[in-house]
Amino acid sequence: MIWWGSDPGRGLLERLAIARLEESTNWLQNVRWRLDGLKLLLDFEIVEDVSRWRLVMHYPDFFPSIPPLVFNADGERLSGHQYGLSGELCLEFRPDNWELSWTGAMMIESAHRLLVGESAE
């Protein structure tokens, strides 16, 4: 069974955590939830100064046992910490250190730190 169907409380927690992040920052914009078949996706943008990064977060079938994955929505290389040209961003939270209580909002914050940090270099 799909995680967000079998654990609607966790689905609500994810939506609320991301809504709180969006409301509390000015850099998280254009948040949009959608389904691709039965896959839950989140489109969003990180905006900092003159930079705008369009991203998509994929919630895996086995979430929250494994973390969501964050990709560039445009299929281009954004970071030296990215697997391939259109691959996922290598963030602080990975399958080897992921904890069940962590959220997609934390993944978005990690993507923000990575992209803003690299753009400042």
Question: What is the meaning of each model-derived region?
Answer:
Residues 22, 27-109:
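Compact alpha/beta protein-protein interaction domains typified by the UBC
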Residues 1-31:
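Generic start-of-chain signal for non-secretory N-termini
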